[in-house]
């Protein structure tokens, strides 16, 4: 986020006493944590043993996923997950316990947007002095440790959640244009008599059970998760 977009706030200043709300955040977390744990909101699973071996975050006692977030970050992220769970239950109650395929698709993209916010609000997110913006935790494909970190202000109107949702929507719109039909058809998947029908197959690239010259595109995606872990 561009610091100049924070309204009348100056670009930087020394912290004041009233800026230190750590005690209030810790107290609020203590009240909510039992409920959130019961609802499976808190990411309290252990980080995989292969992750950074005995280097990086492990040297500083970060062994559980929730330790990757400062208390105020954790509080904000858990609130967003809680609201998402409430939205899911509301949709279920409105549809006799079921969720339509359209709602499922919309909820999926909301989770992608929320996940994007997680990437930029951790104790391993950093300030890019060149771009003058926050860099996400996976900027270096690893869980590095930072003595100081950058973060976004999620509750300011027009920033963070609004930005993340717009970014997700933009990516979805571009994918629809690439793989769409009619006037939205783009060169990636040209119409060739199949009436614009797109079939996506998922499997191992080592052995594709498909005849030669039968597909338009084969995508071999790198194992990003394994790379980071």
Which residue stretches match the model-derived regions?
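Nucleic-acid modification enzymes, centered on SAM-dependent nucleic-acid methyltransferases
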Residues: 1-211, 227-229
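Local beta-strand N-terminus motif with an aromatic residue
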Residues: 214-215
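Hydrophobic beta-strand segment of the Class I
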Residues: 218-219
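Conserved SAM-binding loop
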Residues: 223
């Amino acid at each position: 986020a561009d610091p100049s977009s924070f309204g009348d706030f100056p670009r930087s200043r020394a912290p004041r006493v009233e800026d230190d709300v750590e005690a209030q955040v810790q107290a609020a977390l203590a009240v909510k944590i039992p409920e959130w744990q019961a609802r499976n909101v808190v990411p309290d699973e252990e980080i995989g043993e292969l992750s950074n071996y005995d280097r990086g975050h492990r040297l500083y006692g970060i062994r559980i996923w929730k330790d990757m977030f400062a208390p105020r970050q954790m509080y904000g992220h858990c609130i967003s997950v809680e609201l998402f769970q409430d939205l899911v239950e509301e949709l279920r109650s409105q549809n006799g316990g079921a969720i339509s395929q359209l709602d499922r698709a919309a909820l999926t993209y909301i989770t992608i947007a929320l996940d994007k916010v997680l990437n930029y609000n951790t104790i391993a997110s950093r300030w890019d002095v060149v771009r003058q913006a926050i860099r996400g935790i996976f900027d270096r494909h690893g869980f590095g440790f930072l003595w100081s970190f950058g973060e976004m202000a999620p509750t300011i109107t027009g920033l963070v959640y609004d930005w993340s949702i717009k970014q997700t929507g933009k990516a979805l719109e571009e994918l629809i244009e690439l793989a769409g039909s009619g006037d939205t058809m783009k060169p990636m998947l040209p119409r060739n008599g199949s009436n614009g029908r797109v079939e996506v197959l998922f499997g191992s690239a080592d052995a594709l059970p498909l005849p030669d010259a039968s597909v338009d595109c084969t995508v071999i995606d790198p194992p990003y998760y394994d790379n980071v872990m």
